[in-house]
Amino acid sequence: QPESSAASDVYKRQVRFFEGETDNNELFSKKLAQLADVFVMDAFGSAHRSHCSTEGVSHFIDSCVGRLVEEELNSLEGILNNPSKPMLGIIGGSKISTKINILESLLEKVDWLFVGGGIANTLHKSKGYEIGQSIVENDFLEEAKDLSKNNKIILPETFVVEQKDKSIVEKTFEGILPDDIIYDVSINSIKSLNNIISSCKTILWNGPLGFFEREEFSKGTLHLAKVISESDAYSVIGGGETLTAFNQSNLLDKVGYASTAGGAFLEYIEKGSLPSLDALKAVSYTHLTLPTTL
């Protein structure tokens, strides 16, 4: 513990360097609690982690959430428990294995669920479509097949494809060859959502629709960001690449709420709770004011 008799602020280096932090070690949690009188949990992006500095410390000190966490919770609670309908969910990313639970959870809440990225490839393959050499999770084809039976799910029908000779073309299902690699949804696929987006009152989006790191395969994601920013729907977005798409297009101020979190954003949507928040609920709050969402 640093000597700080005359100081009001104590700054610790990245706590993950300390032994016991990621194991939620009780002794280290107690040591952290000895540094202050009140613990303010304001790291929503880490609220899904049961670590000493996010969960453990709250058992040994008066604790509360900060303003950022309060904003995040109020925003997410609104669209999860009392959203204006109709509601569109959009999920992208490469692996269905990391998002299958959130897909199932969202299907209970939304009117439509548009799926892109590698997740869509696995869903497409489960339905018997050719996807060439595109990223896919073959171990999850059965789960994907069950999901794809839900008529709320919308899959892209045209794609931006890199062919064997490295040329980049737009193709429909019928044109996909065994050596092709699907890297993005086409702008035409986004345009097919125009009527749905224009009728929506609420839109929730997490994850890129293509290989966003390469400029030539970021156009689907960027175009969807533009369309959503121009809609009248209340939009909530989360995840680093999704925020980057809006920020890159100078559209971040056009969304209803931009979450600072990725994993915590998804876990809260799926479960309605997070480990660090559950810990806060379990402790006593002397002289502290909490948001109504807790």
Q: What are the language-model segments listed below?
A:
Residues S5-S284:
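Active-site loop-to-helix "anion-binding N-cap" substructures in soluble metabolic enzymes
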Residues Q1-A7, Y11, H287-L294:
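Single conserved hydrophobic/aromatic residue that forms the stacking wall/gate
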